[in-house]
């Protein structure tokens, strides 16, 4: 057999069979992860953390799967942020900015930015305050507001540029009230 057909077979195996370094997730673990993703109740952070490290691979697979239910993808992304934040970080960035992704999935990505990206969350969240989707603007404003005084200032600055009925403006009003409560009066 010549080198060309062998190379073609190797490429096909890699494309169809996935990465050579990624071990398949055991069926029992995959079933456990899918059970949590499909639960009718809220799954606690402790339950996600109790999963073995291999669960991150299954969660990432679901979060990336465009054929999976958007709610499952959103839950998988949120859980991945708990189980392995380093694996969730690129997905959070990508999905938060993807205007073609379902709103529930974008919202989950935005909700996870602060916990997954830390200080780098601001560079993702601030531009989203101008997103065409109101739910994404609201979630971005809430995430920034919850991140501290600097985030509140970002929300307040953006709110000054839009209508008072915008979700960013409503969040900014609460933010500014909180800032006034925490800043001691000047004497």
Enumerate the language-model features and the residues they cover:
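Amphipathic alpha-helical scaffolding segments comprising HEAT/armadillo-like alpha-solenoid repeats
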Residues: 23-32, 52-65, 85-98, 118-130, ...
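Residue-level detector of extended alpha-helical repeat arrays and alpha-solenoid scaffolds
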Residues: 40-44, 70-73, 106, 137, ...
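Bacterial N-terminal signal peptides
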Residues: 8-17
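Short inter-helical turns and helix N-cap capping residues of alpha-solenoid HEAT/ARM repeat scaffolds
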Residues: 67-69, 100-102, 132-133, 164-165
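HEAT-repeat alpha-solenoid elements in large eukaryotic scaffold proteins
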Residues: 31-40
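Conserved hydrophobic register position within alpha-solenoid helical repeats
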Residues: 44-47, 76, 109, 140, ...
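Bacterial N-terminal signal peptides that target proteins for export
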Residues: 1-8
């Amino acid at each position: 057999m010549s080198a060309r057909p062998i190379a073609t077979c190797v490429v096909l195996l890699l494309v169809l069979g996935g990465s050579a370094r990624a071990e398949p997730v055991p069926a029992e673990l995959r079933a456990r992860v899918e059970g949590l993703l499909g639960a009718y109740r809220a799954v606690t952070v402790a339950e996600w953390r109790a999963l073995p490290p291999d669960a991150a691979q299954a969660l990432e697979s679901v979060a990336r799967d465009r054929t999976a239910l958007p709610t499952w993808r959103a839950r998988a992304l949120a859980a991945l942020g708990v189980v392995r934040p380093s694996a969730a970080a690129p997905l959070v960035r990508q999905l938060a900015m993807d205007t073609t992704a379902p709103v529930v999935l974008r919202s989950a990505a935005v909700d996870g930015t602060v916990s997954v990206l830390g200080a780098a969350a601001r560079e993702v969240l601030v531009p989203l305050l101008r997103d065409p989707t109101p739910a994404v603007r609201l979630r971005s404003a809430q995430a920034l507001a919850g991140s501290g005084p600097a985030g509140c200032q970002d929300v307040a600055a953006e709110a000054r540029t839009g209508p008072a009925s915008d979700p960013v403006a409503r969040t900014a009003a609460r933010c500014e009230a909180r800032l006034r409560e925490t800043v001691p009066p000047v004497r």
